[in-house]
Regions:
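Bacterial N-terminal signal peptides that target proteins for export
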Residues: 2-15
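C-terminal region of N-terminal signal peptides and the immediate post-cleavage residues
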Residues: 12, 22-41, 200-204
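Short, intrinsically disordered, charge-biased short linear motifs at domain edges
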Residues: 25-32, 169-177
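Disorder-to-helix initiation segments
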Residues: 30-46, 60, 67, 71
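Alpha-helical segments in soluble extracytoplasmic regions
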Residues: 49-132, 146-167
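Amphipathic, charged alpha-helical scaffolds that flank and support histidine-based chemistry
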Residues: 130-140
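Short, low-complexity, Pro/Ser/Thr/Gly-rich segments in the mature regions of secreted, periplasmic
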Residues: 182-206
Length: 206
């Protein structure tokens, strides 16, 4: 297997695994919204975001499996993948913010914590995309080394989001939000783990 192929596959797997953490949740900003209405919007947007990430990773893996791929090709694929991730994450955060804060105890604070986490992870992803655009393509060994380093840096992408989820979990008194989401049909795919890998049924970890 060509070094580029191995690197791209590993990078795609890493990103997909990190994106799957989003199944934990993400919350909006604005006026208080009925919890069930907010939950339906949240789950719909989250599932769409996760499926987009999964499809992107699948497409990347398929293209990376071409034995004739060159370092330049590999760089272009990585940049395209990360650029799409940056755009989709921004859109995801914007949609959740527009949904308004869930009308529960600490709803506004929960919203702020999660949105901050999404923004932080989005910023890290954007920074990684900048690095990807500067990846050397000659000699091939230089690309492999730089791509490997990028893949390692990618492991920290979810840290801001995870911190936001942890903070939200502590704010979700009595797991109010989590309990509501488990009753919504729009959230079934997140609850049963059929979207993403390692997903969880609780939005706030409470």
């Amino acid at each position: 297997m060509h070094p580029c192929t191995r690197r791209l596959r590993r990078s795609a797997t890493a990103v997909l695994a990190l994106c799957a953490l989003a199944a934990v949740l993400a919350a909006p900003a604005g006026a208080a919204t009925a919890p069930d209405k907010w939950g339906a919007t949240f789950c719909t947007e989250t599932i769409g975001w996760l499926k987009g990430a999964q499809q992107g990773a699948t497409d990347l893996q398929t293209k990376a499996s071409d034995p004739s791929i060159t370092p330049a090709d590999g760089k272009a694929l990585i940049v395209d993948f990360l650029s799409t991730g940056v755009a989709s994450t921004k859109a995801y955060g914007k949609a959740l913010k527009a949904a308004g804060a869930p009308g529960i105890t600490n709803g506004t604070k929960i919203q702020a914590s999660i949105l901050a986490g999404i923004a932080g992870s989005g910023a890290k992803l954007a920074a990684l995309n900048t690095v990807a655009k500067r990846l050397p393509t000659r000699p091939p060994a230089a690309f492999q080394k730089a791509a490997t380093k990028l893949g390692n840096q990618l492991s920290s992408f979810s840290e801001p989001f995870s911190k936001g989820m942890d903070a939200a979990g502590k704010l979700d008194k009595g797991n109010q939000l989590g309990k509501i989401l488990t009753t919504l049909p729009e959230c079934a795919a997140l609850a049963n783990g059929s979207v993403g890998s390692g997903g969880t049924t609780s939005t706030t970890g409470g």
